[in-house]
């Protein structure tokens, strides 16, 4: 996996998005395009963002997270996240993400709650 590559894992109606090392303008643009396609082709009622490999995130990353949250909220879905390090956690808090999404330490917690 390159530093900008996002990977996806589907578990029924749950989409787990494994974020790259850097969630910046470039990777956020790709993430938006790819998730738009996945949402159009599949019924998804929960999105989980995996931050375990993410070391850097800018405002574009915050923007795409907010966009995906709003999209899921409109359809009655849920968004969780897990694995954020201290630096990314700080950005998520400043961006208001932590007030909107449930955050967990592990993938298992994020999937089953």
Positions of predicted regions on the chain:
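Amphipathic alpha-helical interaction surfaces in cytosolic regulatory modules
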Residues: 25-100
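Short acidic-hydrophobic, aromatic-tinged amphipathic segments that line or gate anion-handling sites
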Residues: 102-106
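Short, flexible active-site-adjacent loop segments at beta-strand->alpha-helix junctions, enriched
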Residues: 21, 85, 107
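STAS-typified acidic loop motif
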Residues: 4-33, 51
């Amino acid at each position: 996996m390159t530093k900008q590559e996002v990977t996806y894992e589907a578990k029924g109606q749950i989409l787990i998005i494994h974020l790259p090392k850097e969630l910046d303008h470039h990777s956020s643009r790709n993430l938006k395009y790819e998730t738009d396609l996945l949402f159009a082709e599949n019924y998804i009622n929960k999105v989980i963002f995996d931050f375990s490999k993410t070391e850097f995130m800018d405002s574009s990353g915050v923007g795409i997270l907010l966009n995906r949250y709003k999209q899921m909220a409109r359809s009655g879905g849920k968004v969780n996240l897990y694995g954020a390090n201290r630096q990314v956690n700080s950005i998520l808090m400043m961006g208001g993400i932590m007030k909107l999404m449930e955050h967990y330490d592990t993938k298992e917690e994020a999937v089953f709650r």
